[in-house]
Amino acid sequence: MADLQKIVDDLSALTVLEAAELAKLLEEKWGVSAAAAVAVAAAPGAGAAAAAEEQTEFTVVLAAAGDKKIEVIKEVRAITGLGLKEAKDLVEGAPKPVKEGVNKDEAEKLKAQLEKAGAKVELK
């Protein structure tokens, strides 16, 4: 126990530059990277802070085409400007994003259009 206390005392006496050099030496000796652990540990906190703010950009996601697939394809074409084949592939490959990075009002409007055509839509 006395040895551990001596190590703690020695580490506490290090300057910031000495501590950084010690970290580099330990990374080389043990073959690890402290930067990766810091990035992983910081990520959950950043996500929680972003979730607390009100979302301003939305992605309109086509969850399912429903019974009126042709009507949904027409709406997807009108919204996205895609060709017939691309719109058909998007509808048949649901769930897929139809439009990304739109504001709340536009997202709600697009959702209503697609639901009126018979699609099941999610906003993310």
Curated annotation (Swiss-Prot):
What does UniProt give as GO cellular component?
cytosolic large ribosomal subunit
Q: Which Gene3D superfamilies match?
A: 3.30.1390.10, Single helix bin (1.20.5.710)
InterPro entries, per the entry: Ribosomal_bL12, Ribosomal_bL12_C, Ribosomal_bL12_C/ClpS-like, Ribosomal_bL12_oligo, Ribosomal_bL12_oligo_N_sf
Q: Which UniProt keywords apply?
A: Ribonucleoprotein, Ribosomal protein
What GO molecular function terms would the record report?
A: mRNA binding; structural constituent of ribosome
Which terms under GO biological process does the entry name? translation
Tell me which family the UniProt entry assigns to this protein.
Answer: Belongs to the bacterial ribosomal protein bL12 family.
User: What task does this protein carry out?
Assistant: Forms part of the ribosomal stalk which helps the ribosome interact with GTP-bound translation factors. Is thus essential for accurate translation.
Subunit description: Homodimer. Part of the ribosomal stalk of the 50S ribosomal subunit. Forms a multimeric L10(L12)X complex, where L10 forms an elongated spine to which 2 to 4 L12 dimers bind in a sequential fashion. Binds GTP-bound translation factors.
Name the UniProt record assigns to this protein: Large ribosomal subunit protein bL12
Recall the taxonomic lineage recorded for the source organism. Answer: Bacteria, Pseudomonadati, Pseudomonadota, Alphaproteobacteria, Hyphomicrobiales
Q: Which gene encodes it?
A: rplL
